[in-house]
């Protein structure tokens, strides 16, 4: 087994799908290496033959290729190497990649105006490396199948809940005057809308899949792999985000609940700013601009008290009004009756 390549590196690495001239759609893997002779190892597996190829790039080769393209100073060389290490984590940023005289050549942007082309040479694939790469691919495909299946289960549950809501709304709409006419106008029989209103089963999905065409074609396989790999990356990003959120919960600023400062009638009980800054009240000088407003508030409060006393002094009016309400009760409109059919 090549001591430079380890199984853990393959399992943790980021696979991507690229179209390579002469090989068609391929799975690619870029690995940073800590070997004194190799800084980058590239694994290429054709989807047609499932035969792995390995390409290597040394520090000396990288320096010579950069110098031949005009990057001679050490600052530029270090910048290109750092950018190359970033590309290994996000191989989708590679502009072009292809086979040229058995070498794997790829290019990437160092800046908006500068592009660097790198030429990696083929390396012998030992028997142990061959099986290690294929084993890693099998584990990757199993994980993608499991992720796709779990995603399908969650999506099916969501669609079932939405179908129940749609059925309830249809029943409620048919129960209203003119509701059936609205449905028939929007979704007449044998129309696309009418078909969308019907419940969909697994058999219906399989029939649509069969009528879709040659879904087992190589292009469809490559597109499916791209979709699943993208879904896996999103899942990992969300998982890392939630884990970091759980770790940072203790460091977040917690605001007090509304009921801490307000009672059930939403009347202010305590000023939170004054509690936080007990000595700030003496530093604030009152402004004369707000005096008329305080008089207005006192006058309005006095009027409210007078109105309240008048309402207490006229109980007969309230009694007569309540009797009128009892004599002429309001009619309630029945709406949205649901029919249950056995």
Swiss-Prot record:
Keyword set, alphabetical order? Cytoplasm, DNA damage, DNA repair, Membrane, Nucleus, Transmembrane, Transmembrane helix
Which is one Gene Ontology cellular component term of this protein? Answer: cytoplasm
Q: Which organism is it from?
A: Saccharomyces cerevisiae (strain ATCC 204508 / S288c)
Ranges for region Disordered: 270-342
The protein's gene is named: NEJ1
Provide the effect of residue 270 to V.
In strain: DBVPG1135, DBVPG1373, DBVPG1378, DBVPG1788, DBVPG1794, DBVPG1853, DBVPG3051, DBVPG6763, DBVPG6765 and SK1
Question: Where is the segment annotated Interaction with LIF1?
Answer: 173-342
| Task of the protein | Involved in non-homologous end joining (NHEJ). Facilitates the transport of LIF1 into the nucleus, where it can interact with DNA ligase DNL4 to repair double-strand breaks (DSB). Mediates mating-type regulation of NHEJ. Prevents chromosome circularisation by NHEJ in absence of telomerase.
Q: Where is the composition biased (Polar residues)?
A: 297-312
Query: Which consequence is recorded for altering residue 281 to C?
Result: In strain: DBVPG1135, DBVPG1373, DBVPG1378, DBVPG1788, DBVPG1794, DBVPG1853, DBVPG3051, DBVPG6763, DBVPG6765 and SK1
Biological process GO terms, please? double-strand break repair via nonhomologous end joining; double-strand break repair via single-strand annealing; homologous recombination
One annotated GO molecular function is: DNA end binding
Q: How does it assemble?
A: Interacts (via C-terminus) with LIF1 (via N-terminus); the interaction is direct. Interacts with DNL4.
Q: What's the protein's topology in the membrane?
A: Multi-pass membrane protein
Give the protein name, as stated in the record: Non-homologous end-joining protein 1
């Amino acid at each position: 087994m090549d001591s430079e390549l380890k199984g853990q590196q393959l399992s943790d690495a980021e696979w991507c799908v690229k179209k390579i001239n002469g090989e068609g759609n391929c799975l690619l893997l870029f690995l940073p290496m800590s070997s004194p002779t190799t800084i980058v190892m590239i694994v290429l597996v054709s989807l047609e033959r499932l035969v792995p190829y390995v390409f290597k790039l040394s520090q000396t080769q990288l320096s010579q290729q950069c110098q031949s393209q005009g990057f001679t100073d050490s600052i530029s060389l270090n910048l290109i190497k750092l950018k190359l290490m970033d590309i290994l984590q996000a191989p989708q940023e590679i502009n072009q990649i292809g086979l040229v005289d058995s070498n794997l050549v790829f290019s990437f942007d160092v800046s908006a105006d500068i592009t660097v082309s790198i030429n990696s040479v083929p390396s012998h694939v030992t028997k142990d490396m061959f099986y290690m790469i294929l084993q890693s691919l099998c584990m990757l495909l199993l994980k993608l199948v499991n992720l796709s299946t779990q995603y399908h289960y969650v999506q099916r549950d969501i669609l079932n809940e939405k179908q129940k809501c749609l059925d309830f709304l249809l029943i409620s709409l048919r129960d209203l005057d003119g509701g059936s006419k609205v449905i028939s106008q929007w979704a007449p029989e044998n129309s696309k809308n009418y078909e969308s209103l019907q419940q969909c089963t697994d058999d219906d999905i399989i029939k649509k899949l069969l009528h879709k065409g040659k879904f087992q074609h190589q292009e469809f396989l490559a597109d499916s792999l791209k979709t699943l790999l993208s879904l896996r990356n999103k899942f990992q990003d969300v998982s890392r985000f939630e884990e970091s959120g759980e770790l940072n919960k203790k460091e977040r600023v917690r605001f007090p609940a509304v009921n801490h400062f307000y009672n059930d009638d939403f009347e202010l009980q305590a000023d939170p700013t004054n509690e936080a800054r007990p000595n700030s009240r003496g530093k604030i000088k009152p402004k004369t601009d707000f005096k008329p407003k305080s008089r207005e508030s006192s006058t309005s409060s006095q009027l409210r008290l007078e109105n309240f006393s008048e309402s207490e002094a006229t109980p007969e009016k309230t009694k007569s009004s309540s009797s009128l309400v009892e004599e002429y009760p309001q009619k309630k409109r029945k709406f949205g009756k649901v029919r249950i059919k056995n």
